[in-house]
Amino acid sequence: MNFEGLDPGLAEFSPAMHSTLDPVLDAHLNPSLLQNVELDPEGVALEALPVQESVHIMEGVYSELHSVVAEVGVPVSVSHFDLQEEMLWVGSHGGHATSFFGPALERYSSFQVNGSDDIRQIQSLENGILFLTKNNLKYMARGGLIIFDYLLDESEDMHSLLLADNNTLLVGGLQNHVLEIDLNTVQETQKYAVETPGVTIMRQTNRFFFCGHTSGKVSLRDLRSFKVEHEFDAFSGSLSDFDVHGNLLAACGFSSRLTGLACDRFLKVYDLRMMRAITPLQVHVDPAFLRFIPTYTSRLAIISQSGQCQFCEPTGLANPADIFHVNPVGPLLMTFDVSASKQALAFGDSEGCVHLWTDSPEPSFNPYSRETEFALPCLVDSLPALDWSQDLLPLSLIPVPLTTDALLSDWPAANSAPAPRRAPPVDAEILRTMKKVGFIGYAPNPRTRLRNQIPYRLKESDHEFDNFSQVTESPTGREEEPLHTVSKKYRKVTIKYSKLGLEDFDFKHYNKTLFAGLEPHIPNAYCNCMIQVLYFLEPVRCLIQNHLCQKEFCLACELGFLFHMLDLSRGDPCQGSNFLRAFRTIPEASALGLILADSDEASGKGSLARLIQRWNRFILTQLHQDMQELEVPQAYRGAGGSFCSSGDSIIGQLFSCEMENCSLCRCGSETVRASSTLLFTLSYPEDKTGKNYDFAQVLKRSICLEQNTQAWCDSCEKYQPTIQTRNIRHLPDILVINCEVNSSKEADFWRLQAEVAFKIAVKKFGGEVKSKEFALADRKELRSPEGFLCCSSMEELKNVWLPFSIRMKMTKNKGLDVCNWADEHELSSLGTPSQWGPARAEEEHGVYVYDLMATVVHILDSRTGGSLVAHIKVGETYHQRKEGVTHQQWYLFNDFLIEPIDKYEAVQFDMNWKVPAILYYVKRNLNSRYNLNSKNPIEASVLLAEASLARKQRKTHTTFIPLMLNEMPQVGDLVGLDAEFVTLNEEEAELRSDGTKSTIKPSQMSVARITCVRGQGPNEGIPFIDDYISTQEQVVDYLTQYSGIKPGDLDAKISSKHLTTLKSTYLKLRFLIDIGVKFVGHGLQKDFRVINLMVPKDQVLDTVYLFHMPRKRMISLRFLAWYFLDLKIQGETHDSIEDARTALQLYRKYLELSKNGAEPESFHKVLKGLYEKGRKMDWKVPEPESQSSPKSKAGLRPGALGWVG
């Protein structure tokens, strides 16, 4: 057939498929169908099929109104009247869907639903249309846009669907079950078993679900449980159709005869009140379809496939006069449907034609239909012409594309200034008559001006806002606040997460050095800046890295592991998750208020400056205690190499300052008590006159503190006013100072002293005072070791009060002298004797020079809640290890943002947004005083067998064989690795206005199981580590489907697994990394990240990258195993032993296919075939025909060394 005016995309079919029926010979053919019809050898060409206006439609009697072609020559498989709009939907055997609007059947939309299978059921919903094919359920908008595409099992053969409620769908077919699908989540929620297979028709009332079976039975099922309540054995052959109305059920079908199945002309009618059959109804046509059409009576419409239609009452006799003919173009009618208003009937035939019969000339498909949305016509060609002869023609009439770039008409930033309009003053009459209730004031309207009338004031006359004109607009563009004063590099940095996580986040943009930053998203990561300060103290770093003990949550051990990661990193950020995990378990930290909730940390509640100063005191005390408790552990035989002996602490030698506290009562009694402290707190003078104080004066006053207080006197035997003084006996090697700028009082003191110091500097370098000493100082500063020119600009000395060096000397009468020190003092002392003596002989005279090494500052930012950053002077040894150069340099450390800075920036404190919190001064030539040799304290004994923490763990359940002494790994050995995780905190995300999802904070994962298998030798594939990690933290989600971890597996009281501590397993992996083994696994980058390990890239063989093409998707281990190894893994849950073995086999396969990397082109072809196969299968592994649920895949290979898991 050739239909003009139809969609050009419709398929053409051969003449053999067309009907051979001659329309002229058919007495029942509607003559109106012959209008504009030409018969030719190629088929029938219909220019227009609608009924002519002369056709008369009798009210109350059904007759044909229109006939249209849905798809040329392709049989109609299903028809459905839309329940929301005035539309008729038609599906074909070719998988094509077409919709027609209104009684005129105007084509509305046409699109392909399935490329190979026929459409078997259509259901209209509020926002779209559901289409059911053989094994696919597709939800599409009425215009053809796919909303979701739900693939069923390939073995399914679906025929019917039923909308149980607005969100639940039942789908049945030729199998022995019915699926329940949630339309909100698009997931299968239930699978109901049916005793009689083959559910091809489903109906529903307020009492039952009705299921029609291919065996000829109709079952009535409960609405809640879907259990069979009643069953009617309607036909002995098969069921053709049935319908339900009120208390009646009518069915038609086929009965078994000697020659086979024959159409039964008796309709079976059942009374649902008595649940029994009533008198069958004999009809005069061969019934294939039937529907109740309850208008005035409960009429039944019975349709035969040849086109005959009969109306009759279900409880009366059929009248032959009620038969009429539909006149299909093809030989058979294929579908039949009735509109919700009962005013229209739709028939679809085998030639793709749709016939609409109505009982009125202007029928309505639904009692209440909403308005249909039509595509807007293109308005581009209908734009009005512009008359260029008009002088006042606005250029805004010309449409231009929206752009975010700067426009030519934009004013330059230098010529722009924010000019806020001041609120007008409140009328004096209003203030006089105002009454207040609480904080709300109200007054009668004085009627002095009109509503919304405000006097306009020019900018020149508003002198009160002149200061704003001095603030230039932010140079970075319109998006930033123009009055924001915090420098960009000091602002709180955040990680932008995408659907790939961190893989596409550019950390190099924030850190162009080879030093490692720290990630900020972990709970209580506010201490990142202090971790960096401790790391860049060379003696502290060596001491911590040499420490190892048996204590599970030892901060010194965890800090040493973190320092090792910072050593290995080449600019990539690290995370202190394991250190902070141990930190959260210490009761003292919680008692001091150092453990912040996520909400408090995100909102910046509390003072971060006070918090980090308390943390500073806590960490030094805790490290001092951990070092004092050091004993040679039995489990870790390599832990004996420590700096200090038992009972002493190198932390004490570095930080501790011996003090002498003297209490003098007014009775003359004096009490002296010795003590020590690890840090000092600045105590500021109460002077409000604006007097100039050197930092050295304030520091001396804070160290040698003198105060009056009430104290107990043994002589007086009562509390008496006493004078308490503190004298120093021994100076520390590292001087730690908490600034305690916690109020505006201390901030004003810093601001005032900085202003006074700046005035002195301007006078000094401005030429008013120029002595020989200053000249020497200038020349010395020009050759400073940091490589910066001193005072190249006066701006560098603004807000500077802190000296870069101080000199301290013990006096003979237990006193202390402190002064600000600059290198010019040493030059002047060469020619003139000084009370301090030459610096080169400082130890002989008890004189020490301290150089500023780090400053920790609190950044005040109301938009982000503030943050903590550190300025650190990185020494030569660190530059030598990282960059191969020998020099010193100041750096800004702001989490993962690291940037070199000028040395003066480290001591500039604008108290409006940059407040000092902690200062670190170190003795000059500190590194030469200590042994800085560091060695790895982890030995091979950590891999030997160890006891499990689980009380119920039995040896028969062992899933691994520990390494023997002759199996110890060597450099380059292969080890298969896999890890499973649980979730501690759920992901925090927000939904943007455009519908996209933005991750604010990723989910916090914790390692739950780590497995290592042998990669070579006779025992290849047998695990030697299979540790379940005990956790004391609250687990939100065990992720059992993906991890195989069940509740109780990580609890030492009830677990039957081999349970260990995270530290124990971490040491095993650290030893393997340090010895130089190569790890083989799938997705190892995430595994090492959660375990908190830094592994050199040449020791990682990740199959997710080995079998990956650039700019293509990553392929799952399950699909790779099925494609290359013909293995089906990860059936119900994941098993780490199975995954690790599979990764090893895939690596062997990679070496085989790529000829050990020698033939990359041939391997590239293999990868192309892999991706083509994956796209065809939608990256899903076909399920086996009979899949048994795996009870335990964690055991050893049967027969391997006689072990069976």
From Swiss-Prot:
GO terms for cellular component: nucleus; P-body; PAN complex. This is PAN2-PAN3 deadenylation complex catalytic subunit Pan2. Residues 368-484 are annotated as: Linker. It is found in: Cytoplasm, P-body; Nucleus. Residues 1179-1205 are annotated as: Disordered. Binds 2 metal cations per subunit in the catalytic exonuclease domain. Positively regulated by the regulatory subunit PAN3. A divalent metal cation binds at D978, E980, D1087, D1139. The keyword Transcription does not apply. One of its GO terms (molecular function) is poly(A)-specific ribonuclease activity. Forms a heterotrimer with an asymmetric homodimer of the regulatory subunit PAN3 to form the poly(A)-nuclease (PAN) deadenylation complex. Interacts with PAN3 isoform 1/Pan3L and isoform 3/Pan3S. Interacts with ZFP36. Residues 1184-1193 have a biased composition (Low complexity). GO terms for biological process: mRNA processing; nuclear-transcribed mRNA poly(A) tail shortening; positive regulation of cytoplasmic mRNA processing body assembly. The lineage of its organism: Eukaryota, Metazoa, Chordata, Craniata, Vertebrata. PANTHER family: DEADENYLATION COMPLEX CATALYTIC SUBUNIT PAN2 (PTHR15728), PAN2-PAN3 DEADENYLATION COMPLEX CATALYTIC SUBUNIT PAN2 (PTHR15728:SF0). It comes from the Eukaryota. Residues 485-924 form the USP domain. WD repeats lie at residues 153-193, 195-231, 244-280, 328-367. Catalytic subunit of the poly(A)-nuclease (PAN) deadenylation complex, one of two cytoplasmic mRNA deadenylases involved in general and miRNA-mediated mRNA turnover. PAN specifically shortens poly(A) tails of RNA and the activity is stimulated by poly(A)-binding protein (PABP). PAN deadenylation is followed by rapid degradation of the shortened mRNA tails by the CCR4-NOT complex. PROSITE patterns: USP_3. It comes from Rattus norvegicus. Contains a pseudo-UCH domain. This ubiquitin C-terminal hydrolase (UCH)-like or ubiquitin specific protease (USP)-like domain is predicted to be catalytically inactive because it lacks the active site catalytic triad characteristic of thiol proteases, with residues at the equivalent structural positions that are incompatible with catalysis, and it cannot bind ubiquitin. It functions as a structural scaffold for intra- and intermolecular interactions in the complex. Its main location: cytoplasm.
